[in-house]
UniProtKB/Swiss-Prot annotation:
InterPro entries (UniProt xref): NADH-Q_OxRdtase_suN/2, ND/Mrp_TM, Ndh2_N
Quaternary structure, from the entry: NDH is composed of at least 16 different subunits, 5 of which are encoded in the nucleus.
Transmembrane segments: 24-44, 57-77, 99-119, 124-144, 149-169, 183-203, 227-247, 295-315, 323-343, 354-374, 395-415, 418-438, 482-502
GO cellular component: chloroplast thylakoid membrane
GO biological process, one term: ATP synthesis coupled electron transport
Protein name, as recorded: NAD(P)H-quinone oxidoreductase subunit 2 A, chloroplastic
Topology versus the membrane: Multi-pass membrane protein
Superkingdom of origin organism: Eukaryota
Keyword Ribonucleoprotein attributed: no
Similarity field: Belongs to the complex I subunit 2 family.
Function as written in the Swiss-Prot or TrEMBL entry: NDH shuttles electrons from NAD(P)H:plastoquinone, via FMN and iron-sulfur (Fe-S) centers, to quinones in the photosynthetic chain and possibly in a chloroplast respiratory chain. The immediate electron acceptor for the enzyme in this species is believed to be plastoquinone. Couples the redox reaction to proton translocation, and thus conserves the redox energy in a proton gradient.
């Protein structure tokens, strides 16, 4: 009898939960329409994979790319709509969140063509790879719009779990297994630290989980200047630091970059930073509004360490992917300047603009590395010597992307850094901007060293990899070159394009 009553109660509770979820999806589903498109694409991928043979594999790429493009289109149609909070306060829709979602979708759209030939040559499972990429994209999009602590914790876990699986996708490669093990262990530790910081924030605010309600709760409980908030700030900064990978939270980055498949590295190098930057901006700016001096100081220290450590160690690297790993550590130091400046002096607009350029510069560089790696089977920097004599197009494309990463005029990277540093200077961050300028000059040194090797490698310096270099006969090679061309063009856009981009970015301020 007792079991029968308990069973009825369980059925009633399950029915209520289902009806509430259906009600939320029915009335709030329009707010996550771009995300719903990706979910539909995921379901369609599974259906086609389970009912088709190997000959229908091009459809998987087509469906993945189409769902991403349709999500971008849905975002653009929703542009400039009034900010809305949906799903009982768990998700917020506004221009600021949507532009970060657009950047994530753009990264994923460009990364899929990069992966086509690599997957075919390495004979990796196609469906699972695309599923992980789309699911990670979905997690990043939900993180950008997350408005409460639970969603901010769950969404990056969705992204991170797929990232762990992608980094260890080549199971026969010992370096890939090592990379995913380190990534998983350190990612799990950082998630624990992050949720511990959330628990302090939750308790100090009187049990609130929504970001704005946390501020109101801290005011009501008079805990906004308490030691508990300082503890929460430290733990949350460490937890978010793993996602952004600034120094000293960068230890996992070089090993994961070197051991993971190159298209995966291209995907992780940009999407994780975009999603984490969006989340960090809102977390620091809203719940820690009363502790702005404290988190400004913490981020300044992280930015200085990142710019110095990343660019100094990058000089000594012999692997192209490890060099880009340390370069990305330095690049995130520049992005942090925009987070510190905030919206009062155009910091967020400059950060968004620079991240848009960084996506094109970084993905363009990785596209060149994917092509070279597939044709030669090496990642060593010295093996690039004399590439210009064999493939001028690839060598020039790589040179332009590296020069843009270094910030040489008149390339896009120069104007992105210039605007970012100018906003920091106007905000009074003189020491931070000075460090940024010095480390930018330092980064140009190791980029130019690679370019010199590409263009002027002597006969005795040319390794057998370049001497026997030949183009790939695979037709899918065109997709990699297409992504590379798009990224190279975007990396070389002159300063005339800056004004409309900055105006759009300034419209995203909450």
């Amino acid at each position: 009898m007792i079991w029968h009553v308990q069973n009825e109660n369980f059925i009633l509770d399950s029915t209520r939960i289902f009806m509430k979820a259906f009600h939320l999806l029915l009335f709030d589903g329009s707010f996550i329409f771009p995300e719903c498109i990706l979910i539909f694409g995921l379901i369609l991928l599974l259906m086609i994979d389970s009912t088709s043979d190997q000959k229908d594999m091009p459809w998987l790429y087509f469906i993945s790319s189409t769902s991403l493009v349709m999500s971008i289109t849905a975002l653009l149609f929703r542009w400039r709509e009034e900010p809305m909070i949906s799903f009982s306060g768990n998700f917020q829709t506004n221009n600021f969140n949507e532009i970060f979602q657009f950047l994530i979708l753009l990264c994923s759209t460009l990364c899929i063509p990069l992966s086509v030939e690599y997957i075919e040559c390495t004979e990796m499972a196609i469906t699972e790879f695309l599923l992980f990429v789309l699911t990670a994209t979905l997690g990043g999009m939900f993180l950008c719009g997350a408005n409460d602590l639970i969603t901010i914790f769950v969404a990056p876990e969705c992204f991170s779990l797929c990232s762990y699986l992608l980094s260890g996708y080549t199971k026969k490669d010992v370096r890939s297994n090592e990379a995913t093990t380190k990534y998983l262990l350190m990612g799990g530790a950082s998630s624990s630290i992050l949720v511990h910081g959330f628990s302090w924030l939750y308790g100090s605010s009187g049990g609130e989980i929504e970001l704005q309600e946390i501020v109101n709760g801290l005011i009501n409980t008079q805990m906004y200047n308490s030691p508990g908030i300082s503890i929460a700030l430290i733990f949350i900064t460490v937890g978010i630091g793993f996602k952004l990978s600034p120094a000293p939270s960068h230890q996992w980055t070089p090993d994961v970059y070197e051991g993971s498949p190159t298209p995966v590295v291209a995907f992780l190098s940009v999407t994780s930073k975009v999603a984490a930057s969006a989340s960090a901006t809102r977390i620091f700016d809203i719940p820690f509004y009363f502790s702005s001096n404290e988190w400004h100081l913490l981020l300044e220290i992280l930015a200085i360490l990142s710019m110095i450590v990343g660019n100094l160690i990058a000089i000594t690297q012999t692997s192209m992917k490890r060099m880009l790993a340390y370069s990305s550590i330095g690049q995130i130091g520049y992005v942090i300047i925009g987070i510190i400046v905030g919206d009062s002096n155009g910091g967020y607009a400059s950060m968004i603009t620079y991240m848009l350029f960084y996506i094109s510069m970084n993905l363009g560089t990785f596209a060149c590395i994917v092509l070279f790696g597939l044709r030669t089977g090496t990642d060593n920097i010295r093996d690039y010597a004399g590439l210009y004599t064999k493939d001028p197009f690839l060598a020039l494309s790589l040179a332009l992307c590296l020069l843009s990463l270094g910030g040489l005029p008149p390339l896009a990277g120069f104007f992105g850094k210039l605007h970012l540093f100018w906003c920091g200077w106007q905000a009074g961050l003189y020491f931070l901007v000075s460090i940024g300028l010095l480390t930018s000059v330092l980064s140009i040194y190791y980029y130019l060293k690679i370019i010199k090797l590409l263009m002027t490698g002597q006969n005795q310096e040319i390794t057998p990899h370049v001497r026997n270099y030949r183009g790939s006969p695979l037709r899918s090679n065109n997709s990699i070159e297409l992504s590379m061309i798009v990224c190279v063009i975007a990396s070389t856009i002159p300063g005339i394009s800056m004004s409309p981009i900055i105006e759009i970015a300034q419209d995203t301020l909450f």
